Design a protein with these regions (language model features):
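Bacterial N-terminal signal peptides
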Residues: 5-14
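Sec/Tat signal peptide C-region and signal peptidase I cleavage site
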Residues: 15-20
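Low-complexity, Ser/Thr/Pro/Gly-enriched N-terminal "stalk/linker" regions
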Residues: 21-76, 83-102, 106-113, 158, ...
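Well-ordered alpha-helical scaffold segments within catalytic/enzyme domains
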Residues: 22-31, 75-91, 129-149, 190-205, ...
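Solvent-exposed loop and edge beta-strand segments that line ligand/cofactor-binding
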Residues: 48-75, 111-129, 165-189, 225-255, ...
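Eukaryote-skewed repeat-based solenoidal scaffolds used as protein-protein interaction platforms
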Residues: 147-235, 249, 266, 273-280
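Extended polysaccharide-engagement surfaces of secreted carbohydrate-active enzymes
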Residues: 270-274, 278, 284-534
Length: 534
């Protein structure tokens, strides 16, 4: 038995300062102006990368300076382009939108889908997100288009709807046919809104009936105690020994919950809307006082960027749609928009706080994805609500335990911390800490002191992640680790971990009994190595 004494920094208040929102007069128009100014900066920068007169296979596409290629989901930028064309009257945005959609023919398939990438991946489940962006562009701004262009875009939308209807293995919450497992839940959640909207546009009640069926099935995919939406991982039919199911905060707040909210409002599904609201409130507990989302524990946190996710859209529109009865949602949007502004350098949104300092270029996926989300929020009518400048994690509440993800949030003085023993795995192992770890430590003045990373960095979704040319890479999660013959053994991967929490005055004690194992739960050559940490 080895005893390792883990020095908790949570109560070491060596830095002064209080956690509170900035004392700034807030109004809906102020928020909209901030968001729109950021949107213009992003979109104008994107246009500097739009290809022109190079080759028919490139013209209209927007080249990513980090990945040296055109991302197949770049068509999502049609919404912000059409919004700015309508808002400003500047033809450059309309022309750019038409040229962009012309380039999208490179990833458009005969079955009505759009591929996620050109000749890199044939995955086409992301058709649902392309369809939502194109639907909203036509719904709000289709009057700007000539008849030929508008009719062509609408025909592609109709074909996309048919594709979603014919591919339950991508979008359904029911096992059918030759399906081996259900797809990640963000696809099912998003198809409800897409099919409901397209059903209305094309007078297709069969689309809307399928949306209703999927939405009804999704009601069974919220956890019992905390109402987390689960399904971001393959093992969904029974919980782990600690009662956990696969949850990813990033995909939930930036795609699934917003699109479910849009669907519930459009279909007037009050039962589902009540569930979604409760889930949104639970997820809001994880927003840090600076507007960041704490996804240090999620199953797909390998795409966590601090302010959100690498290729997910953004939470603003869905939360704004319900802000008339939840004014704290307005404050959450305001703080996140300001964090996005701070994370924008040379007109592009960077995927991490230290990317610029590390010399890592910004992938444009983050920019066009969140430009789409900002636009979705700006398309909505202004809400009338009394501002609430307090978010849940502003309060010095001590500790909150979220049973369904076996995670504790600690709030003492200016410190915020996350301690997790969340043991639901993704389809790829080693994506997040499991064996009892402080996955985030944050201070009001210093910001994040440390934050969890993948246990071992690999390109799980290579087309959607960035490689790193540094010579030495290691996990950023505090841990006990041993390397033997090139294999890493640590507590982060241990699925057989016991955690006990106690409190003494202002001290939060976590006693952990764990083991050193590799990502396949194998022990070192000499056998099991138990570890005790306090």
């Amino acid at each position: 038995m080895r005893n390792v004494f883990f020095v908790a920094l949570l109560y070491v208040l060596s830095l002064s300062g209080q956690v509170r929102a900035e004392n700034i007069v807030f109004s809906d128009s102020d928020l909209r102006n901030e968001a729109e100014n950021l949107l213009v900066e992003w979109v104008d920068t994107l246009l500097t990368y739009q290809c022109a007169e190079l080759n028919p296979a490139l013209d209209g596409g927007i080249l990513c300076p980090a990945c040296a290629r055109i991302h197949g989901r770049i068509g999502d930028a049609v919404l912000p382009l059409m919004y700015l064309a309508d808002k400003t009257g500047n033809d450059k945005y309309l022309i750019a939108a038409k040229r962009l959609m012309a380039w999208m023919e490179n990833v458009h398939r005969p079955d009505g889908s759009w591929m996620n990438d050109v000749h890199v991946s044939d995955w086409s489940g992301t058709t649902v997100f392309a369809a939502i962006a194109l639907y909203e562009a036509l719904h709000y701004h289709g009057h700007l288009l000539d008849d030929s262009t508008r009719n062509h875009w609408k025909q592609q939308l109709l074909e996309a709807g048919e594709f979603m209807m014919k591919n339950p293995q991508m979008y359904s919450r029911r096992m059918q046919g030759k399906m081996k497992r259900l797809n990640n839940v963000n696809y099912s959640a998003s198809v409800t809104y897409a099919l409901q909207a397209l059903g209305g546009m094309f007078n297709r009640p069969d689309f809307q009936e399928e949306a209703r069926i999927v939405a009804s099935d999704l009601k069974n995919f919220f956890t019992e105690n905390d109402c987390f939406l689960y399904g971001e991982g393959p093992k969904i039919w029974s919980p782990t020994k600690n009662g956990c199911l696969p949850v990813d905060l990033g995909y939930n707040i930036e795609e699934s919950l917003p699109n479910l909210a849009y669907y519930a409002l459009m279909a007037d599904n009050q039962e589902l809307l009540a569930i979604v609201e409760r889930s949104m409130n639970t997820h809001l507990e994880f927003m840090l006082p600076d507007g960041a989302w704490d996804n240090s524990w999620g199953t797909r946190s390998f795409k966590w960027t601090y302010w959100g996710g690498r290729t997910s859209d953004g939470f603003m529109g869905g939360y704004y749609a319900l802000a008339d009865r939840h004014p704290e949602y307005l404050e959450a949007i305001r703080r996140n928009v300001r964090l996005l502004r701070k994370s924008t350098v040379d007109g592009l949104l960077h995927a991490g706080r230290d990317y610029r300092a590390s010399g890592i270029p910004a992938c444009i996926h983050h920019t066009f994805g969140h430009a789409k989300a900002l636009t979705a929020f700006l398309e909505l009518p202004s809400v009338k609500a009394t501002p609430n400048k307090t978010l849940p994690r502003d309060a010095e509440y001590g500790v909150k335990f979220f049973r369904d993800i076996r995670t504790w949030l600690v709030a003492e003085g200016p410190w915020r911390a996350t301690f997790t023993g969340y043991d639901a795995e993704y389809k790829v192992k080693g994506t997040h800490p499991m064996g009892g770890a402080v996955s985030l430590l944050w201070h009001a003045q210093a910001g994040p002191v440390f934050a969890a990373t993948m246990n071992q960095y690999t390109l799980i979704e290579a087309p959607n992640m960035q490689s790193n040319s540094r010579k030495y890479l290691m996990s950023g999660t505090p841990r006990v680790e041993m390397v033997q013959y090139g294999t890493i053994y640590s507590n982060l991967d241990d699925l057989d971990t016991d955690i006990t929490y106690t409190k003494e005055k202002d001290t939060h004690n976590f006693h952990v009994n764990t083991h050193l194992v590799d990502i396949d739960q194998q022990t070192p050559i000499q056998g099991s190595i138990p570890v005790s940490m306090d």
